[in-house]
């Protein structure tokens, strides 16, 4: 029995990067032998075990065969006679198909096992598929795109790009389950340059299948005086990259991605203006979130940003009453943390424009000041003072907030 570290751990070590993931393959062992060494079985489809001390995952070397379309259509074979190379050949990219032996004390020993040229592709900065089995799992298209967001200087090898396009044309992407699509998109959004993920998906045709709402934004013009980059799709990519550069959360990055969906449905005769695109964005965003089963915290923030980002940009022109109405519509008084994220997304929107990446965004500070003032109003005391007139409470609280905001930010009420 031999144990090997495989995949990302070897790749990242060769690149001089911190090792994020540690995956292990065990060659020449049976499930019974693993259990005898106190490894705990956890795999459903094939034998995966947790180490008794570190709780890291160890999988028996296996081969796999495609039996049906989509992500789940595989049959696995595992036995002591499955070799390391047979296990590595089923992996997606050459840079992920390398291994090193692990000694009994956990140290990596011996040379890098690299049967498919992964080290050469690392040096060439190429994503290249290992073999013909790549076409058997459509998730690999999403994984390549996600790796492009992490390793932004890497390119997809021409033969791999052609294979990905063929898979999309064959309908393989259409068989993906929504949860897995969201999982890969979310991970890609959290990488250093998420725009690269969408570029790779667009180049192979997958973006039009899994996120047609985003694909439709490319080529849609905007007013050049507001958006020097002109193309709406380019703008959205700049926005998500700015959000990534700032280290913003996944909900903020998803809101940044989806804030302008409605611009794709602007009537051609009014372009490049996009009057009312905020409402159309909301109408497109709701079914998108339902289709991909987007988590509530991502969906709810994205809806606020899609609906209100135009108003957030215009707050320097607003009086106190309009500011308070905006805070109330965005539910900022009850959910200040979410509103803070909405400000991050709107700031990314403002700075995700060609040549305006560092432009000041005083709107955020004004809204923060307004929210502090509005939340300081003692609604309970006002309600107590109007105990016999409950119909007047809501309006009285609103007027008190308007006065507080007017004083705090120095604008007329």
Swiss-Prot record:
Annotated keywords: ATP-binding, Hydrolase, Magnesium, Metal-binding, Multifunctional enzyme, Nickel, Nucleotide-binding, Nucleotidyltransferase, RNA repair, RNA-binding, Transferase, tRNA processing
Any one Gene Ontology BP term: RNA repair
Keyword Hydrolase: yes
Positions bound to ATP: 8, 11, 91, 143, 146
Cofactor(s) the protein requires to work: Mg(2+); Ni(2+)
Signal peptide as annotated in the record: none
Residues reported in the UniProt entry to bind CTP: 8, 11, 91, 143, 146
Residues engaged in binding Mg(2+): 21, 23
Cofactor notes: Magnesium is required for nucleotidyltransferase activity.
Catalytic activity of the protein: a tRNA precursor + 2 CTP + ATP = a tRNA with a 3' CCA end + 3 diphosphate; a tRNA with a 3' CCA end + 2 CTP + ATP = a tRNA with a 3' CCACCA end + 3 diphosphate
Keyword Transmembrane helix among UniProt keywords: no
GO molecular function: ATP binding; CCA tRNA nucleotidyltransferase activity; cyclic-nucleotide phosphodiesterase activity; magnesium ion binding; phosphatase activity; tRNA binding
UniProt EC number: 2.7.7.72, 3.1.3.-, 3.1.4.-
Highest taxon of source: Bacteria
Family annotation (CDD domains): NT_ClassII-CCAase (cd05398)
Further comment: A single active site specifically recognizes both ATP and CTP and is responsible for their addition.
NCBIfam families: PRK10885.1 (NF008137)
Known function: Catalyzes the addition and repair of the essential 3'-terminal CCA sequence in tRNAs without using a nucleic acid template. Adds these three nucleotides in the order of C, C, and A to the tRNA nucleotide-73, using CTP and ATP as substrates and producing inorganic pyrophosphate. tRNA 3'-terminal CCA addition is required both for tRNA processing and repair. Also involved in tRNA surveillance by mediating tandem CCA addition to generate a CCACCA at the 3' terminus of unstable tRNAs. While stable tRNAs receive only 3'-terminal CCA, unstable tRNAs are marked with CCACCA and rapidly degraded.
The protein's assembly and partners: Monomer. Can also form homodimers and oligomers.
Family under the similarity heading: Belongs to the tRNA nucleotidyltransferase/poly(A) polymerase family. Bacterial CCA-adding enzyme type 1 subfamily.
Comment block on domains: Comprises two domains: an N-terminal domain containing the nucleotidyltransferase activity and a C-terminal HD domain associated with both phosphodiesterase and phosphatase activities.
Name listed for the protein in its UniProt record: Multifunctional CCA protein
Gene designation per UniProt: cca
């Amino acid at each position: 029995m031999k144990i090997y570290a495989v995949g990302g751990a070897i790749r990242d070590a060769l690149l001089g990067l911190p090792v994020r993931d540690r995956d292990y393959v065990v060659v020449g062992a049976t499930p019974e032998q693993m259990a005898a060494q106190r490894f705990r079985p956890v795999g459903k489809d094939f034998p995966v075990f947790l180490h008794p001390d570190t709780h890291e995952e160890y999988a028996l070397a296996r081969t796999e065969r495609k039996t049906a379309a989509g992500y789940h259509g595989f049959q696995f074979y595992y036995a002591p006679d499955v070799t390391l190379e047979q296990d590595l050949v089923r992996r997606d990219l050459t840079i992920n198909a390398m291994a090193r032996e692990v000694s009994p004390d956990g140290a990596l020993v011996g040379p890098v096992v690299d049967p498919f040229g992964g080290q050469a592709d690392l040096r060439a900065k190429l994503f290249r598929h290992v073999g013909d089995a790549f076409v058997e799992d459509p998730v690999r298209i999403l994984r390549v795109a996600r790796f492009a967001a992490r390793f932004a200087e890497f390119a997809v090898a021409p033969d791999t790009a052609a294979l990905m396009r063929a898979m999309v044309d064959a309908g393989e992407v259409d068989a993906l389950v929504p949860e897995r699509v969201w999982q890969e998109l979310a991970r890609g959004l959290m990488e250093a340059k998420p725009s690269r993920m969408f570029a790779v998906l667009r180049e192979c045709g997958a973006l039009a299948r899994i996120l047609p709402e985003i694909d439709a934004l490319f080529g849609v013009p905007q007013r050049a005086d507001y958006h020097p980059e002109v193309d709406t799709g380019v703008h959205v990519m700049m926005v998500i990259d700015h959000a990534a550069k700032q280290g913003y959360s996944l909900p903020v990055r998803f809101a940044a991605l989806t804030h302008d969906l409605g611009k794709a449905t602007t009537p051609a005769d009014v372009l490049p203006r996009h009057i009312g695109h905020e409402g159309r964005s909301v109408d497109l965003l709701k079914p998108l979130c339902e289709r991909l089963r987007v988590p509530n915290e991502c969906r709810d923030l994205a809806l606020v940003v899609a609906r209100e980002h135009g108003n957030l940009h215009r707050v320097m022109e607003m009086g106190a009453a309009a500011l308070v109405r905006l805070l109330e519509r965005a539910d900022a008084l009850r959910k200040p943390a979410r509103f803070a994220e909405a400000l991050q997304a709107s700031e990314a929107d403002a700075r995700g424009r060609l040549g305006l990446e560092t432009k000041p965004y005083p709107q955020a500070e004004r809204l923060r000041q307004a929210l502090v003032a509005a939340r300081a109003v003692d609604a309970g005391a006002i309600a107590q003072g109007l105990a016999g007139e409950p119909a007047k409470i809501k309006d009285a609280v609103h007027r008190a907030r308007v006065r507080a905001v007017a004083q705090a930010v120095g604008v007329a009420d």
